[in-house]
Amino acid sequence: MPRSFRSLALIAVLALLPGLAACSTTVAMQPAKGANDPACAEIISRLPQSISGQERRWTDAQATGAWGDPASILLTCGLEAPGPSTLPCRPFDGVDWLVDESQADQNRYTLTTFGREPAVQIYLDYAEASSADIAQALAPLIRDYLPATGSVCSSASDLQTPAPTPAP
């Protein structure tokens, strides 16, 4: 192979490297305390390639997942299961989710599984991704691999006791 052709090929490869590196940026995340739970490994190894039109990205922490560029969906597995909460709790496809809307003015929600051990938490930019799409994509994995604790969503009306009937 002529030397000039090899030099040209090397220059072409070097010119492409920055573009390839930009396509494979890793999302920086923090693992949860229980990230080494085998149930999390089962879920992470089966995460979908795409959710709500957002493509999966590499992360730098165990038991995490990310989708979108920039990342609009972040998943962390291995959190402690939440106890009773004042947050809205919404069941979807056999999985109960606590919904934290405290950052809704910035298009952000945090969804946390309720009644599953360990818990999964999703950070969501709802301007870019649908919470229904996320729940639909992840519910089968959560049902199959995260054991239910027996806790379920309930509302204040579920807990109210009827007023006693006056005695005649």
Indicate where each model-derived feature is located.
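Short, charged/polar surface micro-motifs in flexible loops or helix N-caps
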Residues: 79-86
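N-terminal secretory signal peptides
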Residues: 28-79
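Secreted/processed peptides and extracellular or luminal domains of membrane proteins
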Residues: 29, 46-47, 83, 95, ...
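Bacterial signal peptide processing site
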Residues: 23-27
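Bacterial N-terminal signal peptides that target proteins for export
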Residues: 1-12
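Extracytosolic low-complexity repeat regions of secreted or lipid-anchored proteins
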Residues: 88-168
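C-terminal motif of bacterial Sec signal peptides marking the signal peptidase cleavage site
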Residues: 18-22
